[in-house]
């Protein structure tokens, strides 16, 4: 009994000694697992194509799982990483990624394997000089489309205005990025700047520059208002490059937020599958109206025009309600109506949420009713 007691005391002593450096390490480093599960019932309709009912993922926030880590290096310096994988929460499968910012780089994901398609980067940060990022990340032009959209995802989102290629409309692989101080998160403070260059990593030939991305974003983030301009260009010989330009602003009045977004997406060559268009121009008005202590009403109106042979246009109306049951859990509902004119036939939603495709000039509508939980 005495021997066991002595052994126990020795073990406790060893663990106590070992805990000293571990405690010091824990004070300067962190590792976090985070994510969102978002599932809802959806019904989408399109003129000339019938309707579709389904269980969908990401109606209010994108379903995802991520891992991030950080180490303080001293003197205001730090290093870290962030890896985030998109989830099809309704089926338990992962989503596709892209390796070279070109259609040829789309990953095959027939098995539904997990990929860190949303972001996968390593960074070095200085409080006074800013942050350098290496890896797969959001393009500078994407942030205005996301931050100034009251819905951001689901049937209400504004990203249905894409033209040309969607490979780099949101993210780019093989990138080197810079973010000015105060701009490491989605919301930047004070005067700020973001820049990116990404590589298609082709070995040679006439298409060796394909997939190279150049992007920049600049603006100001204040207490009650902010504004920014963004641009990005993806080199592509067949389309004579793909360019995005946008500008946006928001104003917070009491607990209510108002947003405006304008932009243009263009290709150097006209695209035959888009009725020989080479340009889409759009603008959006949006708001998030606070209701009581736990609710808010997002709403938006977007209009786009396409310079095709038919002079096509589309208008999108969206309204929803989000009721927070707690800090991490919410119920939501969103309704959207899309009014297409000419040869354009935008569905009510795109991507994994895509509804039926209407006939050219046909209307589309749909709703999401769901539950979202973050961790």
Predicted regions mapped to residue ranges:
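Transmembrane beta-strands of outer-membrane beta-barrel proteins
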Residues: 31-39, 75, 79-83, 132, ...
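Extracellular loop and loop/strand-boundary signature of outer-membrane beta-barrel proteins
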Residues: 50-54, 106-108, 162-164, 203-204, ...
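Detector for outer-membrane/organellar transmembrane beta-barrel domains
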Residues: 211-324, 335-337
């Amino acid at each position: 009994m005495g021997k066991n007691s002595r052994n126990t005391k020795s073990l406790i002593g060893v663990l106590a000694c070992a805990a000293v450096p571990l405690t010091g390490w824990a004070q300067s480093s962190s590792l976090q697992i985070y994510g969102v599960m978002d599932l809802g019932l959806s019904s989408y309709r399109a003129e000339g194509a019938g309707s579709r009912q389904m269980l969908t993922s990401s109606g209010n926030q994108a379903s995802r799982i991520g891992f991030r880590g950080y180490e303080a290096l001293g003197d205001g310096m730090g290093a870290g990483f962030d890896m985030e994988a998109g989830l099809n929460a309704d089926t338990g499968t992962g989503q596709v990624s892209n390796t070279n910012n070109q259609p040829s780089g789309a990953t095959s994901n027939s098995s539904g394997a997990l990929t860190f398609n949303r972001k996968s980067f390593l960074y070095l940060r200085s409080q006074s000089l800013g942050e350098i990022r290496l890896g797969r990340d959001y393009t500078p032009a994407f942030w205005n489309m996301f931050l100034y959209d009251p819905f951001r995802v689901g049937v209400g989102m504004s990203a249905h205005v894409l033209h040309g290629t969607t490979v780099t409309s949101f993210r780019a692989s093989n990138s080197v990025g810079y973010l000015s101080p105060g701009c490491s998160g989605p919301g930047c403070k004070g005067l700020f700047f973001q820049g990116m260059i990404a590589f298609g990593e082709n070995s040679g030939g006439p298409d060796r520059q394909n997939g190279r991305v150049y992007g920049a974003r600049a603006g100001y983030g204040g207490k009650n208002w902010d504004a920014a301009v963004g641009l990005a260009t993806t080199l592509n010989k067949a389309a004579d490059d793909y360019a995005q330009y946008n500008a946006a602003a928001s104003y917070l009045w009491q607990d209510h937020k108002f947003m405006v977004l304008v932009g243009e997406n263009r290709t150097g060559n006209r695209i035959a599958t888009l009725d020989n268009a080479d340009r889409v121009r759009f603008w959006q008005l949006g708001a998030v109206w606070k209701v009581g202590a736990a609710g808010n009403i997002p709403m938006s109106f977007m209009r786009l025009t396409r310079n095709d042979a038919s002079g096509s246009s589309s208008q999108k109306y969206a309204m929803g309600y989000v009721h927070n049951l707690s800090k991490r859990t919410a119920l939501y509902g969103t309704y959207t109506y899309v009014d297409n004119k000419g040869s354009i036939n935008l569905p009510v939603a795109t991507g994994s949420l895509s509804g039926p495709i209407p006939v050219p000039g046909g209307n589309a509508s749909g709703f999401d009713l769901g539950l979202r939980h973050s961790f």
